């Protein structure tokens, strides 16, 4: 499972910064205040921290049914939480159903103005594309996998999402040697 719970903390931090920026002389003081309040537990009742706890519980659950229960609790708390939807889709047994559900999820999302891993709001969209690419790759549908991976390739220059190895496999499977070489060079630069 891709670990994205830290993004919830980043969302909380971003919200805190936007609300309190004018109150501080320096960004360092602002961040220090945020961290002090975070460490003191001042944010424990926020939606972001509740979501984090539910994601962790879902990840640590002993059964699929228990995990599903936690993901559904996440969606009850925050119906637009894309990553909970992704995780529920992953539990579906048939890959064609997973692909259909992921395609519907992608279509329901607002495409990011810029595909960039450094933009937190773009990451769920990019993860959906990676999920689809992985299913296509599993069924040797290499060109479809490449089509899913390509926008992420352009938006995740340092391979934070860890998909470059899979894109190389897709390029080799599709006998797309030139693109595969470029992906391999990027992979070497990231390591």
Regions found by a protein language model. Name each.
Residues 49, 80, 117-124, 159:
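Structural signature of alpha-solenoid helical repeat junctions
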Residues 120-134:
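Extended HEAT/HEAT-like alpha-solenoid repeat tracts in very large eukaryotic scaffold/adaptor proteins
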Residues 84, 128, 161-163:
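TPR alpha-solenoid repeat register
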Residues 1-112, 136-155:
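N-terminal alpha-helical interaction modules that lie
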Residues 151-152, 156-162, 166-169:
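Preference for long, well-ordered alpha-helical segments
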Residues 163-191:
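Long, repeat-rich segments with strong aromatic
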Residues 143-146, 159-161, 178-181:
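Short, structured loop/turn "capping" segments at alpha-beta junctions
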Residues 49-56, 87, 131, 165-169, ...:
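"A position-specific structural signal for the A-helix of alpha-solenoid helical repeats
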